[in-house]
């Protein structure tokens, strides 16, 4: 409804139905083989210029971590959601958001293997090598490209895998840990800027407070605790001890490697398990040392993103290859080769509206499965 001239307007009893100048007709005759079809929407991001080495890293290094970690989280969340309608209401959006990319990574890997994307890329790279070798100027610019890509990605594989475990099992899964991470960031700021203490009402505490209040609106302690326990076990099993920092190894040894007991202790002795506890604890000024006496804050501060970034940088320095920079060179080279061949090209669909069109037809999603009748 809008105003008398058909323009958008606030609610009024005098509003009238808006009649658009043009409309799309919706067919009610069903969908049949050979029908024209069109899809329009935002694809998020695509990576159509990835090298075979970059595809291999995604398929064999990062996607397996994402799939396993998120599947473990989802299984725990679903069990709690099925047992309690209130938890289902609180966690439905979280569950969808986590499962969305978990399913994406799972089916991406299935399709990468099914269509042998690494093999397709490698075959194109063989053509690229011949194209580079055919011209002295291209040899001078790109002669070491493919060898550098292989060396660079192989050198950084373990550092990338560990960083992915850090992202998927440490900083993201638990709301309590996310609150603790914010306290860790607060401690870093206090130490950097010479802030003696922080309490509720200070501008330095405002971000922690507002983010915790927003996050804890949809929070179940038992669910979060079980998720954190499982994710911490996964982190400890897959990330070497030298990446844990100082406080986490001390707590882990104190509880003799019993992660559930460690998490029980941390949850019982932290201010991060509720908005009310957080505000009550910061009702009086807290020094950086006092904040780090909180076991959750201590663990969050112990495992630093900087350590993972430094390990990745060290891998690059040891190999003498920055894989990301080589990937950019590869993008230029493959684009130039395709252009010289007259191959039509288009940019990656990064946050742009894209149109896909064609005709309806059968599909074979898996071996020995053939679907000829369109889904209605």
Residue positions per predicted region:
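Short, structured beta-strand/loop micro-motifs enriched in basic residues and often containing a Trp
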Residues: 13-22, 355
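Cationic-aromatic interfacial patches
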Residues: 58-283
């Amino acid at each position: 409804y809008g105003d008398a001239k058909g323009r958008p307007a606030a609610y009024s009893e005098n509003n009238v139905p808006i009649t658009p100048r043009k409309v799309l007709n919706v067919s009610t005759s069903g969908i049949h083989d050979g029908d024209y079809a069109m899809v329009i929407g935002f694809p998020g991001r695509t990576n159509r210029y990835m090298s075979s080495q970059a595809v291999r890293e995604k398929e064999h290094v990062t996607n397996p971590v994402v799939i396993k970690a998120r599947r473990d989280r989802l299984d725990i969340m679903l069990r709690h959601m099925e047992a309690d309608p209130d938890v289902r209401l609180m966690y439905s959006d979280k569950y969808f958001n986590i499962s969305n990319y978990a399913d994406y990574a799972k089916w991406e890997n299935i399709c990468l293997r099914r269509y042998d994307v690494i093999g397709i890329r490698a075959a194109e790279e063989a053509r690229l090598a011949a194209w580079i070798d055919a011209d002295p100027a291209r040899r001078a610019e790109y002669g070491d490209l493919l060898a550098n890509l292989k060396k660079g990605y192989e050198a950084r594989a373990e550092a990338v895998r560990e960083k992915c475990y850090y992202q998927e099992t440490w900083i993201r899964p638990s709301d309590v840990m996310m609150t603790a991470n914010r306290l860790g960031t607060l401690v870093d700021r206090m130490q950097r800027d010479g802030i003696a203490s922080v309490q509720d009402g200070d501008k330095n505490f405002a971000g922690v407070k507002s983010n915790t209040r927003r996050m804890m609106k949809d929070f179940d302690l038992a669910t979060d605790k079980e998720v954190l326990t499982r994710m911490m076990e996964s982190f400890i099993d897959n990330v070497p001890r030298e990446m844990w920092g100082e406080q986490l190894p001390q707590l882990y040894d104190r509880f003799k490697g019993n992660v559930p007991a460690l998490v029980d202790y941390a949850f019982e002795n932290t201010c991060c398990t509720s908005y009310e506890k957080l505000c009550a604890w910061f009702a009086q000024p807290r020094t950086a040392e006092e904040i780090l006496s909180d076991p959750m804050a201590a663990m969050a501060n112990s495992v630093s993103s900087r350590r993972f970034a430094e390990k990745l940088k060290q891998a690059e320095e040891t190999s003498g290859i920055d894989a990301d920079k080589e990937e950019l060179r590869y993008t230029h080279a493959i684009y130039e080769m395709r252009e010289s061949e007259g191959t039509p090209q288009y940019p990656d669909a990064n946050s742009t509206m894209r149109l896909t069109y064609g005709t309806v037809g059968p599909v074979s999603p898996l071996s020995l499965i053939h679907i000829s009748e369109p889904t209605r």
